[in-house]
Amino acid sequence: MNFLNNFNNSKNIRFKSFEETLKICIKRKHKIIVETGTARGKTKFFFFNQYNWKDGMSTPMFAEYAKYVGGKLYTCDISKKNINNAKKFTSKYSEYIKFNVQNSVEFLEKFEGIIDLLYLDSLDGHDPIAASNHQL
């Protein structure tokens, strides 16, 4: 799993979980990942670009996997700002990612095709009622 080495650090506390999940995906020859809730990724601090490791960096890790296996990552987020930011820090994977600005429930209802791995990580944290209605 050398293709994930850039993501293995002490701040990425969910790395081992992602690594184990993707090992299983490789064994099963999975190529299609669908993710609800796009990682926000890099943040700008003065002139430094820093990764926001609190997100777990799911979007770039799944994109790296998609590149490795010749697959595709479909990711959706209700926030256009999050999608646009993710597009910037994953630009080298653009042929392996399809971004969608959409409510996750609506996105999944309309998704056509096989899903090998479904990663549910969307939440309306600012609105607990909307989050409970999502039930994701």
Question: What is each of the regions a protein language model found here?
Answer:
Residues 1-136:
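A short alpha-helical cap/connector motif
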